[in-house]
Structure formats: structure tokens, C-alpha cells
Amino acid sequence: MTTDYFTRKQSYSGFSDGADSPGSPLASRTNPLSSKVTSVLSASYADSDIRDALSLLDKRGIQNTAETRRQLRLDVHREVIESNGDIIREFGHVAEEASELMKQQEQMQAKQELLNAFNAHFVMSDDDIAMLTSTAEPVNDRFFSILSRAKKIQNDCEILLGTENQRLGLEIMEQTSKNINGAFQKLYRWIQREFKTLNLENPQISSSIRRALRVLAERPSLFQSCLDFFAEARENILSDGFYTALTGTTVGGDEDPSIKPIELVAHDPLRYVGDMLAWTHSATVGEREALEVLFISDGDEIAKGIQAGLDSEPWNRIAESEDEVGHFDGLKALNELVDRDVAGVARVLRQKIGQVIQSHEETIMAYKIANLLNFYRGTFQRLLGDDSVLLDSLATLEESALRQFRALMRDHITSLQAETQVAPPNLSPPDFLHEGLKQLTAIMKTYETSFTSPETREAGFEPILTEAFDPFMKGSENVAKDLSAPRSTIFTINCLLSARATLAPFDFTISRVSQIKDTIEEHAATLIDHQYIFFLEKSALQPLLQALSATTDIRDHPVFQPASLIQASQTLDDFLPSALMDAMENLKDLQNSMLVRQITEEAAEKFCDDFEKVEERLMKADEEREESLDEKDGEPHHVRALYPRTGGEIRVLLSIRIWNMFKTWRLEIT
């Protein structure tokens, strides 16, 4: 302050550096002496600064001399500079320490910020830990948010484990893992509580439980335990529902008036079994749809969670095969869960249907039940896949029904074999064959309604034909053995025709129909031969044919002597008027008129061919006789004149008469 005062006063007292020199413009206007006087007079000596300055000058013992006044300013500046230098020297180390402290402060601030960031990222608050692990806290969006943060902390701890000091990372990872495990345990117990009150019939299933399942899937063991609990609960619910549907009363004994009990139709086995299977199918479809909403509606998030859990727990996969570890099949898991839910229903279903199968001894009913079971087995196979407890139960029941069907068929065949079976007088199919074919028709109509694939349809019905068709045809063959020819052949053809008419309308018996057709043709060939022989014998053509085959020169053969030829010609003429009538009479018991016509035509054709051979041989014999005789021997003896009928005449007569006789015969049969 004193220094400032002296500096300021010097500018007023004339100790300036010549600012008011005579050469300046101001000097030309003002007298220097006047300025100094004015400056002195204008100063207030009552000012404390002036007094302090004067007191200081007095203490320094400064003499008021011209030299002193000239040096005073310099001395003051020098002292000021020296004072400042002393101050700088004295406070230099303080400045250094202050700078060091500022650097330390910056470092501390950086460490504090790093610590805060570390705590914010890696350290969870007590409230967050309580939200994760305490069962008193709800499972809400905040819970899942904190759990996501905890999992992120656990993953980021890998960075800390990469540092030189791994202790911090290990401690944080241990604590975080403990918190996460506690959170999953809390989530597991919460889902179990929710499952107890879950209503799958409600189309708006809580989104929170779906989210909880997606998260819990990251712990496959807990997720599987949860599914086991759920499956057991649903199995009990569906079993109770099936019991109510069967009886109309709940497990507790309360009657439900809104339900018509299935057991009311127990007197109708097929409807009873069908209603039980229909209820099971409806329940299975509803269960699957509800579980799709619960487990698959959010895409493959659960599958991703389970896969992530499997990847993070390799020790759980040591005993598993590579196929099981490689990929989680969500659809297969869903099918398995649905199958477990209906396992209780499957047990009751197996018991009830098994009782129906064993208590009814109707052959057709047993097969209809087997066919119904086959239909539902295919339906459930498309719904649940190939590996299913319900499918196994249905397959077992189907096999049981087929065994019952086969056993009843064998018993029926055995009873028929014990009876003496004879062919009816008109050689029509016997009653037991009619009964068997009628039964087979009912079976085929039932099989026709099944959803068997076209590729396996015919092969699938072949075992049924073996049980329900072949024994009856075998019985018919045994009856035919007791008949003489051609009655046995006619009886056999009638049975085959009836069988073919029964099988032909169905597309899954084409092979059998073709086999029957071939067999009919074989037996028809036998009848053709029989009719052919009949034509030969009754027309007296057979001795002529035999003679032609035995000798080359017929002139000396007894059969071709005039008397024999005249007798043969007369026999032929007597035969022709009634030939077709007699031939038709042989086949009057054959029940297919078109087949009768075909057999007769072919036999007549063979007869005409043989007659033309005889005619040709007789004409040739006459020509040879004419060449061997001389003119003087007289006219030759012509054998052809003794046997005048021609092949053309025979063909015309038979072709015309066969039509007329066939029409007359059909009218008589009709």
C-alpha cells in the first residue's frame, strides 16, 4: 500500500519522467510551477495513506535532498522488486507442493470416477440383491432387468480375470454367481406356484410366466424339473377331466349336470370306444395348442435359452450322445410334454377299451374297433410324432382287437369244419360261404373308410383276407372234392364268381380279384374240355378222330367202311338238333350266363375244327382212291358221299343255334 502511495504521489509532485516537459503541448498552455503548486495544494494531508507514507519515510531517516528525491523512486522500485523476489523465493516450494497436490487431486478424482464406474457396473446394491433372491419381492420387470444385469456382470468378469490380480474378479464372480443362482431358484419356485393356478383354457395366458419360462430355460435342470412338475399337475387335471367325462361326476363326487356321461352309451361298444377316443383327441389338441402359446409363441427363445444352458454346463452332457447335444428340438420337446400330460388318460383309455374288446365276441365288432383304433393311432401320430406313450397304448389296443378278431374267426371256422358241409343241389355257393362273404363285405366297408395310405392300402388288408376269406374258400374247395366232374368244377366256379363279385367293388382287393379271375379261367378251361369231349362222343366223331391218328390209310379201317360211316353220319344228324340243348344242360347250374356262352362257344369251335380235319381226310381219301383205280374197274366208292356233312354246315348250324339256344336257356334260367 505504501509503495502504491509513493508511486501515485510522485506523479502529482513533479517527479515525473517529463510528461509535462516544456516541449509538450501542455507546457505551452500551462506553467510548470503552477501545475506543481496546484498538485501540492490539491493533496489532502488528512489521508491515512499519506500519513503512513510520511511516517515510513521518517522512520527510514531519509533526508529531503535533491539527490534523495531523485533516487527515491528508484530505491522504492528496487525495494519492491527485492520484496517480490523474497516472496517468490519463500513461496516457491509452496507452489510446487500446491501443484503436486492438484495433480494428486486429479488422480484421486480419476480413481474416484473409475471406482464409481466399477461399482456401478460390477457391484450390485443390497436392494438389487434382495430383489433377485428374496421371495418376498415380486417377479416383475425390475427382477428380470436386475437378473440381466447380473448375468452381464458375470460375463464381464472374464475381463477382470485377465488382469494380474485375479482375486477381485474371482470374488465378484463368486458373489454374482451366488446371486444369479438364488434368482433362478426364486424364479423356479415362483413358476411352480403359478403352475398350480394356471388355467390353460384361458386364451390370454400371462406374458410374465412365458417370460419366466424363457429365462428359466437357461438352467436346463431347473427347467426340466419345472416341466416335470407341470406335466404331473396337468396329468392329474386331465385324468380327473376324463373321469368326469366318463361318469358325469367329479373326482370329489359332485355331479356335473352340463356333461352327458360317455358311459351311458357303453351298451354300444363302437360308439363307446369312439366317444372315449374323441374326447382324448379333443383334450390332446387343446393341450397342444395351449402349450404352443406357453412355450413356442415367442419363437425359439426357449430353445435358445436351453441351448445356451447346455453350452454353459458341459458337465451335464457327458453321458449324452452327440445327437442329443447338438441341437434342441422344440417341437419334439412339445410333443413329449403333451404326451406326458395325457399319459394318465392313456392308462384309463387302455383299461376301458381293453375291457370292451375282451367282453364282446362279435367278429365284425372286434374288427371295427381295431379299425377305429388304427384311425386314431394315425391321427395321434401326426399330432404327437412317432414316439409317444399314447401311441403305444393305441397300438397295443389295436393289436389286442385284431387278436380277438382272428381268434373269433378261427373259432367260427373250426365250428364250420366240425359240421358236415355239402353242396346245394343247384351247385350254388353254400350258406357258410354266403355268410363269410357277407361278413367280409362289412369288414371291407369298414376298412374302406380308414385313412390308410394308397401305397400300403392293399398290403394292409391282405392279413384280413387271410383270416376272413381264405378259410371259407378252402372250405368250399373241400366241399367240391366230394362232387364228381363236371359238377365239382361248376360248384367251384360258382363259389369263385360269388367271391369275385364280393371283392371287385373295392380298390384294395385288386390282386385277389385278379387271382380269382385266373383261377376261374383255369376251371373254365376244364369245362371247355368237358363240353368238347361231350360234342365228340355224342356226335360219333371221336372214333373217326382216333382212327385218323392211328393210321394213314383209312380205306381198310373198320371205322371208315361204308356201314360204319353211314352209322356215324346218322348219329351226327341225330345229334345236331339237340347238341346245344344237351350241352347247355351240362352247364345249367353255372351261375354266370356269359361264362356259359363262352365255354360252349369255345368247345363248339374246337369240335368244328376237328370235324373239318375229318372232312379233309375223307376228301383226300376219295382223291387217292380215284387215282388208284383204272377206268375198267368202274366208278370208285366215295366215302365222302357216305359222310356228307361239311364243316361249313356244322359251323352255320352251331353258330345259329348256339345264339337261339343260349337265349332260350337264359330265359329258362331266369
From Swiss-Prot:
The keyword Protein transport applies. One of its GO terms (cellular component) is Golgi transport complex. Disulfide bonds: none annotated. Residues 1-32 are annotated as: Disordered. InterPro entries: COG6, COG6_C, COG6_N. It is found in: Golgi apparatus membrane. GO terms for biological process: intra-Golgi vesicle-mediated transport; protein transport. Keywords: Golgi apparatus, Membrane, Protein transport, Transport. It comes from the Eukaryota. Coiled coil: none annotated. Pfam families: COG6_C, COG6_N. It is a peripheral membrane protein. Residues 1-14 have a biased composition (Polar residues). The keyword Disulfide bond does not apply. Acts as a component of the peripheral membrane COG complex that is involved in intra-Golgi protein trafficking. COG is located at the cis-Golgi, and regulates tethering of retrograde intra-Golgi vesicles and possibly a number of other membrane trafficking events. Belongs to the COG6 family. This is Conserved oligomeric Golgi complex subunit 6. It comes from Sclerotinia sclerotiorum (strain ATCC 18683 / 1980 / Ss-1). The gene is COG6.
